[in-house]
Amino acid sequence: MRSLLSFLLIGVPVTLILTLVGLTHGMIEDSQQRQRGSGADIVVRGTNAAAAINFSGATLSEKFVDFLQKQSHVEMAVGVLSHNIQLPLTVTGIDLERFTAMAGGFTYIAGGPFRKPNDMIVDRYYSAERHVHAGDTIMLMNRPWHVCGVIEAGKLSHIFVELKVLQELDSSTGKVSQIFLKLDNPSNTAAVIQALKEKLPEYPIYSMEELTSMINVNNIAGVKEFTWVVVGIGVVIGFAVVCLSMYMAVLQRTREIGILKSLGGSNGFILGIVVMEAMLLGVGGTLLGIAMSFGAKWLIHTLVPASIQMAIVPVWWPIALSITLASAAFGALYPGLRAAHHDPIEALAYE
């Protein structure tokens, strides 16, 4: 029973570490996938756009859409407006016909396209998380919206409304957040970007691959630091659990330790036994923590599939194991040294 409890207490910080890393990777991968789902080859943003991962704010005139549409090799230029409602969720205003032509169309699970100004399209993740269905009315941005359709996920946003309607609500008439360009041939991307930067040197212009590569852990303030704080907490918990568990084990096995000492067991041999048992506890706790991280992913995907995404990151499994084993080894030192220095006569007399 003591060992099972130790496995659990060691497994919990392992689960926390793997879950935090999985959330970071999952949300980054989801954002990258949805950006690629737009079908664009190039993204143009406003001159006062913030970090590369911030897609909200109306900073571009719609006139640029027509200007960019006329550029060489540009097959389609589409402006969108993003409005943050509840991080990390945004409402995206689109010209439905042009956006779906660029993105390859929406796959409707239920309902259909916009028909009225207050119509809203949501993807299946938002539908599952908020329990909304085609035909329902929901409140967002202090007004009612009619959910006219539910689509498959992966097309830029979880929530879509008519561009003109969102511009009016956002007091951004004639403005968009970013402009997506689809080229006649993706191989022309570098040449088109170079030409555009010569004409619009003050505007951030990215290829889709460049933009998605910017959506990473290094560009999200505080994530790396917070991850290592959690790792540090995991080390402390693992050390304390193993130290207490092995200390109790040594107390319970005082007589057995005395027998080993009387049979010629060296201090190093006794210490090695204690450390080995601690390492086994560490391995077992890590395996349990990995298993529980799959449970955490299932729970997150079931409860909040639109707001939070979690990925399983196997590359962190050996890192978690190394952290746990190091904690176990250090945690076993004091109990092991105490056991190694037991007087065999006192140990055999212990009841």
Across the structure, where does each feature detected by a protein language model lie?
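Hydrophobic secondary-structure segments that place a key small or acidic residue at a functional site
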Residues: L81, L89-D95, T107-V165, K175
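Peri-transmembrane interface segments
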Residues: S31, Q194-A240, A249-T254, I259-L260, ...
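Transmembrane alpha-helical interface segments in multi-pass membrane proteins
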Residues: G234, R255-H301, I319, I323, ...
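A short beta-strand structural signal in non-transmembrane regions
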Residues: I42, Y126-S127, C148-A153, G174-L200, ...
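Hydrophobic alpha-helical transmembrane segments of multi-pass inner-membrane transport and secretion
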Residues: M1-M27, A221-I259, M279-L288, F330
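Hydrophobic alpha-helical transmembrane segments
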Residues: S3-F7, A291, P314-S322
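Hydrophobic, regular-secondary-structure patches
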Residues: G11, T15-T90, Q194-E198, P204
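C-terminal membrane-exit region of the final transmembrane helix in multipass inner-membrane proteins
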Residues: V313-E351
